Design a protein with these regions (language model features):
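Short, Lys/Glu-rich amphipathic helical modules
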Residues: 18-44
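Catalytic cores of enzymes
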Residues: 36, 58-493
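Amphipathic alpha-helical coiled-coil segments
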Residues: 36-63
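Short, charge/polar-rich alpha-helical segments
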Residues: 1-15
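Non-catalytic alpha-helical coupling and interface elements of nucleotide-dependent molecular machines
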Residues: 16-19, 23, 46-49, 53-56, ...
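Conserved positions within tetratricopeptide repeat
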Residues: 8, 12, 42, 451-454
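Charged/polar helix/coil "stalk" or linker segments at domain boundaries
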Residues: 2, 20-24, 28, 90, ...
């Protein structure tokens, strides 16, 4: 039975990936990769058919079990008090929202906007979140008017159900998957004057994050699957983290690597590098930028969780494919990968979403430097959290959506209960503060939900002291701009 399920889930995952590749613009088509995926899918389907015939013969009662779609009543029964499930569908001319709460109240409403119109709105908002600038004072103002317009468009039909809600379970569609709903204002807002502390005026904005905790879900069926998992003690225990892999021999020789920076009044803020592969005809691991700041982040989370780094923190050359595949994940409640997420076509021969690990040029014989979606499917996890802290896997690009769906689906199949992913390249100091605060809160309050722990950590960063110049004894800028506090989203339960 396990073999049949494995073949099915691999075929399903590859089929979704093939569908996504077929849906991109003609100039982005990858015919060779599509053909290879088709061959793999057919092979897996043949294997599954063979195994099913064997199961029917030897275990006829198992063959009678079939997956059923989640009905409205089943969806309601999945919910706890204070939870609201909201799903979207974006169409060519009109879109739709559907919501249900634990009491059984249901709302279904059209949205007077097409998929392309909503995509343009999302892209407009993301200009201030992923601006590609190199100075703090060059960060654009966040478009509060457009954000509130989108809030009204998407959520006004279901406001009645949200009035007393504490947790919004969100099933986004298309471009909505790259927009953290936490950044939507719940009332019209005009940005005031920040004064000496730059960005402090954003603290007065009535963000949705101040009212609700939010979890994203791949589907309603995924919620059903996750909530069927056996319960376990709330306290976090063991941890394993992989970070700052080395993608070339040159990186291995360098004591330090220059990273992208935002400079403010002479004080640099580091942003994590992202791969610059657009227009590159032939790409290898060596083109990927190193992520040196992620090593300290992995170590800090180990300290917060009171885990000995020896045997739990694998950085640089140790962050390799062989190490990942050989690790025993039994009891590892938090699994962290601080590296790049890649999609088909990013590198030569890459046919599946993958995580980039240390190159075989650095550690010969330790794998090909890629943890593919299919290899993730084969991991045996029982993790409350899988953290993808530097992947930018929820990016606005079609490729980013493909990465988060492919990698996310694989980790859920492998046994993860929730993912923590970023929606744009994070500012490294704020990201490290947010990440460690999140796990500090979960350790201090074991019953605290994942989404609520993230929400509280966001607010603490937003309302906190910000970047303090120790010599001057004052805050130069706060982390209240959503670029700093809103990149991470919880996907799962």
């Amino acid at each position: 039975a396990r073999g049949e399920q494995d073949a099915l889930r691999r075929a399903n995952a590859l089929s979704v990936l093939l569908t996504q590749l077929l849906g991109v613009r003609p100039e982005q088509q990858l015919p060779k990769i599509q053909d290879e995926l088709r061959r793999e899918i057919l092979s897996l389907q043949d294997e599954r058919d063979r195994l099913r015939r064997q199961i029917v013969k030897e275990y006829p009662e198992y063959a009678e079990l079939v997956s059923q779609p989640v009905s409205l009543e089943q969806a309601r029964k999945l919910l706890h008090g204070g939870e609201v499930l909201v799903t979207f569908y974006l169409g060519e001319t009109e879109s739709y929202v559907w919501a249900v709460d634990a009491s059984g109240r249901v709302v279904f409403s059209p949205i007077s906007a097409s998929r392309s119109e909503i995509a343009r709105s999302v892209q407009r908002l993301r200009r201030a979140l992923d601006p590609g600038v190199d100075r703090i004072d060059a960060i654009p103002a966040f478009d509060l008017a457009e954000a509130y317009r989108l809030y009204g468009l998407l959520l006004s039909p279901v406001l009645e159900l949200l009035q007393d809600a504490r947790l919004l379970l969100l099933v986004p569609h298309a471009d909505l998957g790259s927009l953290p709903f936490a950044i939507l204002p719940t009332a019209p807002s005009v940005l005031g004057i920040s004064g000496v502390e730059q960005f402090s005026a954003y603290r007065a904005v009535p963000w949705l994050a101040r009212r609700l905790s939010i979890e994203q879900l791949p589907s309603v069926t995924a919620l059903a699957s996750l909530r069927r998992l056996p319960s376990r003690s709330a306290a976090l225990s063991s941890f394993v983290g992989f970070g700052d892999p080395l993608f070339s021999a040159q990186q291995a020789k360098q004591a330090s690597t220059k990273v992208g920076a935002l400079a403010s009044r002479g004080l640099p803020l580091q942003r994590r590098n992202v791969p610059q592969l657009a227009g590159v005809e032939s790409a290898s691991l060596a083109l990927l930028p190193r992520l040196p700041d992620t090593g300290e982040e992995v170590r800090q989370i180990a300290r917060v969780l009171n885990v000995d780094p020896a045997g739990a923190v694998f950085l640089n050359a140790e962050a390799n494919e062989q190490r990942v595949l050989a690790t025993d994940y039994t009891g590892r409640r938090v699994v962290m990968f601080a590296t790049h997420g890649l999609v088909p076509g990013d590198l030569d021969g890459l046919t599946q979403p993958a995580l980039a690990l240390t190159s075989p040029e650095v550690v010969p014989g330790a794998g090909d430097g890629l943890l593919s979606m299919e290899e993730i499917l084969g991991l045996k996890l029982d993790a409350d959290w899988v953290v993808l802290s530097a992947c930018n896997t929820a990016a606005a690009e079609e490729a980013g959506a493909e990465a988060v769906s492919g990698l996310g689906r694989a980790f859920f199949y492998a046994g993860a209960r929730a993912l923590l992913v970023s929606s744009w390249p994070v500012e490294t100091v704020a990201a490290r503060m947010l990440m460690t605060e999140l796990f500090r809160r979960q350790v201090a309050q074991p019953q605290l939900g994942k989404a609520e722990a993230l929400r509280q950590s966001m607010l603490a960063l937003m309302d906190g002291p910000g970047y303090v110049d120790v010599k001057m004894g004052r805050t130069l800028y706060t982390y209240a701009h959503p670029l700093f506090w809103a990149p991470f989203v919880v996907i799962g339960d």
